[in-house]
Design a protein with these regions (language model features):
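N-terminal presequence-like segments and the immediate start of the first folded domain
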Residues: 2-91, 97-155
Length: 155
């Protein structure tokens, strides 16, 4: 009976995460945070890249919201690059905002510098708070790197 169970377990295909590539931060302090909290910066599953939410903090003194968003979008761009993708491969953006009224215009201005047509799907949600508490916006993206053909827009 036990030998039959062992054969069944050995024949079981690996789980989905065992067939993925995990992208972790290069900076030791950030990597430790990800390991302590138990999450990847990004994960490549087949031809899809799932980037964990990147939290944009309140702008430093003398900086603008656009400056803060630019740092966040650049960080996402770096994660995409290390995952073998770029902003052109992004098919979905989900953003969480603590104040949609003041954050949307600067976010859109910066997004237009990084994200070009054909545009990905985008959902923006207002939330009461983010982790860490100094966070004002969190941006999560999904990229698709399969079938890298010339993109076209529908009429």
């Amino acid at each position: 009976m036990l030998s039959a169970l062992a054969v069944l377990l050995a024949a079981t295909p690996p789980g989905a995460r065992e067939q993925t590539t995990v992208i972790m931060p290069e900076e030791p302090q950030q990597r430790q945070i990800h390991e302590d909290w138990g999450f990847a910066q990004a994960i490549i599953a087949g031809e899809t890249i799932h980037v964990s939410g990147v939290v944009i903090g309140a702008p430093a003194e003398g900086a603008s919201l656009q400056d803060a968003y630019d740092r966040g979008f650049a960080r996402i761009g770096d994660i995409l690059k290390r995952s073998g993708a770029s902003w052109h491969d992004v098919v979905e953006i989900i953003s969480y905002h603590t104040d949609v009224t003041t954050q949307m215009a600067p976010m859109i201005a910066v997004k237009h510098r990084y994200v070009k047509a054909p545009y990905p799907a985008w959902t923006a949600v207002e939330v009461s708070r983010l982790i860490p508490d100094r966070g004002i916006t969190e941006i999560k993206v999904t990229a698709y790197i399969g079938g890298r053909k010339q993109s076209t827009t529908a009429p």
